[in-house]
């Protein structure tokens, strides 16, 4: 049976790729926020509860035709929506490639899907907490790199990264030959960058058993072991 495992690495400001990584996280935030802005305006337009604005269409003349088609289409995550976000990324000349742009949009899709699920639960009175539509990212946004953009050359040298990175993030020798599926970089609560390497590992599936042993650390005895089946308990004295 294969299971997913995660290894974490901290990225220091002195790292040779820190500036590049920071740029990627900022670009990811801008792409996420731009895509989310469009979705929020569409949501406000359909809800008739908020003021909405389509003035942003005029800011991108080359995308105007696509925008208007998308508004008429009135579907959140259509093929046309993905195309608009990819064209926006190219227009802004971001360093993030289109595969990563798609990952960012997919993450936004998950956020909106969660909102609709919670809204349905609230309407069915199975959820009573306040819910909000997905908000904008403030400073950075997670960037996920799948195995298609992971540099095999760097991985052999003991680094996880893309071809555009000067060096990549140093990993331990035991991680070189892992079945690496992707890695992602984000900023944590302390505003520090963290890299997570996600890999798959084959593990032996253990058969479930009804037999249980319980260990109790005692005062007079060092410990006592009791069983839930026909076996005499064990008591070990400390002296």
What are these regions (language model features)?
Residues 1-239:
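Nucleic-acid substrate recognition interfaces
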